[in-house]
Amino acid sequence: MERSPIEAVLFDNDGTLVDSEAISNEVMVTTLGRHGIELGLEEAVTRWSGVDLHLMLRVLQEESGVTLPGDFLDEFRAGQLAELEARVEAMPGAAEALRRLELPRAVVSNAPVTKIALCLRTAELMEFIDERHLYSAYDVGKWKPDPASYLHAARSMGVAPERCAVVEDSVSGATCLDAADAVLDHRGELPDWPDVERLEALTDLLDRLD
């Protein structure tokens, strides 16, 4: 990587380490539908992937004219966690990449730490991650694309942000990284960004870090 030496790797979780996004989207679509807001699965992916959940719900309420109950997020989270615990799996290559990675690593997500940990345990990835290095946007009160959660993770690990490789899969995650002065490597069909390397599989990261 051009911005070497890299001293730590910060991974996004949903869609990067664990195949959780389709499950979460299904639960969100169903839960919104119970309260009169129609959201298609395709729109959930193309419009809202990686976006702050609070922002998404605020916009959907404004557009639909429907006011969601105060405990909506609790209802959604309960259904989401139950489905994830039953169904979530690791992304292809995630276990191998984490097993072979020789650098310190952390997981940084917009989701609560409880959800991050549940997904990693269910997908049998927690053995490769120190649970002290699970970082949530809820820790800092700012959500991607704001870089605050990545900066918080880097500081907590004692590593300068510019010496962290950041692995993301969403436009939202990519957008925040210039401000964080971190390197982004991502998987999936995303636009091209300067200084961003595209990964076809997580194991490709190991070659880039050599």
List each model region and its residues.
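Asp-based, Mg2+/Mn2+-dependent phosphohydrolase catalytic module
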Residues: 1-7, 103, 112-210
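Active-site neighborhood of HAD-like aspartate-dependent phosphohydrolases
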Residues: 1-45, 63
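Short helix-capping segments at alpha-helix termini
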Residues: 34-38, 64-68, 124-128, 158-159
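Helix-loop "lid/cap" segments that line or gate small-molecule binding pockets
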Residues: 29-32, 52-66, 119
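Short beta->alpha linker loops
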Residues: 23, 48-52, 76, 89-93, ...
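Short, acidic loop-to-helix structural element flanking the phosphoryl-transfer center
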Residues: 5, 82-107, 113, 117, ...
